[in-house]
């Protein structure tokens, strides 16, 4: 892969409408007939880049990876699992001002994949920068998840930690939480705010999970640190919303 050379596209706005597809970038045919398409997206000074595809379809065996030019940050593989009826997909952040898009297509499905990039967001703030939280920085209503509030809390707190998500809609961030339904079906519903998104935002939203605090003791006298910025999911459907209560129910 290091020997492959792609085309470089340069953007400069914070959120930019683009028109990039397989006619851009570069194809490389492998010895077994499989092929790889690559394109390098450059946005000078960007802390991160994230992407919206308005035509996304991965055939069986096809996969898409996004990674920084220095290979320190990686998203993927995006596969047929991420195919949606809308044909759209939004990604999480890739850190760096240069990001490679790399699509792999097996010989038996040549020409079946579709990939069209319609929007690129130039990130100018780093959500990872302030990982250290000062003592007494939280509000009174914020409960330390590692402090027990009942006999059964120890069994529940890890589930609560894992349910919290950051929600990325193009160039804005919100928070949300996984909730269950009354039939305990395990359907992945996210509860977030109505002001965060509409139906089109939900289609291209990306979700970050894995907010598990490395500090597991209650009320320590040292600063706390956020968990890893990993484990992302892309694509969802707006199931219900209510502006009066500022509620949105999302199915991921």
Segments (PLM) and residue ranges:
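Serine endopeptidase catalytic core focused on the charge-relay Asp
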Residues: 94-250
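Single conserved hydrophobic/aromatic residue that forms the stacking wall/gate
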Residues: 1-6, 11, 250-251
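Short beta-strands within extracellular/lumenal beta-sheet-rich domains
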Residues: 32-41
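Short, surface-exposed beta-strand/strand-loop-strand elements in extracellular ectodomains
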Residues: 59-72
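Beta-sandwich interaction modules
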Residues: 76-96, 106-109
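Extended, low-complexity, turn-rich repeat/linker tracts enriched in Gly/Pro/Ser/Thr and Asp/Glu
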Residues: 56-62, 198-199
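Extended extracellular/luminal ectodomain segments enriched in beta-structured repeat modules
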Residues: 44-50
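Extracellular beta-rich ligand/substrate-recognition surface
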Residues: 24-33, 169
């Amino acid at each position: 892969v290091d020997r492959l050379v792609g085309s470089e596209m340069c953007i400069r706005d914070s959120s930019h409408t683009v028109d990039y597809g397989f006619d851009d970038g570069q194809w490389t045919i492998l010895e077994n007939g499989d092929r790889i398409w690559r394109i390098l997206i450059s946005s000078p000074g960007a802390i991160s880049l994230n992407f919206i595809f308005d035509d996304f379809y991965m055939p069986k065996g096809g996969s898409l990876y996004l990674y920084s030019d220095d290979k320190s940050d990686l998203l993927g593989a995006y596969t047929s699992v991420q195919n949606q009826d809308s044909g759209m997909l939004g990604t999480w952040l890739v850190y760096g001002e240069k990001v490679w898009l790399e699509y792999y297509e097996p010989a038996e499905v040549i020409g079946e994949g579709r990939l069209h990039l319609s929007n690129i967001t130039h990130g100018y703030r780093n959500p990872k920068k302030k990982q250290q939280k000062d003592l007494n920085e939280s509000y009174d209503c914020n409960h330390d998840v590692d402090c027990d509030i009942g006999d059964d809390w120890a069994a529940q707190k890890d589930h609560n930690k894992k349910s919290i998500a950051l929600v990325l809609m193009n160039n804005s961030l919100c928070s949300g939480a996984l909730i269950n339904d009354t039939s305990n079906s395990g359907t992945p519903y996210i509860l977030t705010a109505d002001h965060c998104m509409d139906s089109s935002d939900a289609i291209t939203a990306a979700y970050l999970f894995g907010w598990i605090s490395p500090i597991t003791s209650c009320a320590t006298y040292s600063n706390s640190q956020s968990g890893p910025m990993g484990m992302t999911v892309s694509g969802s459907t707006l199931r219900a919303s209510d502006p009066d209560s500022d509620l949105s129910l999302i199915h991921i």
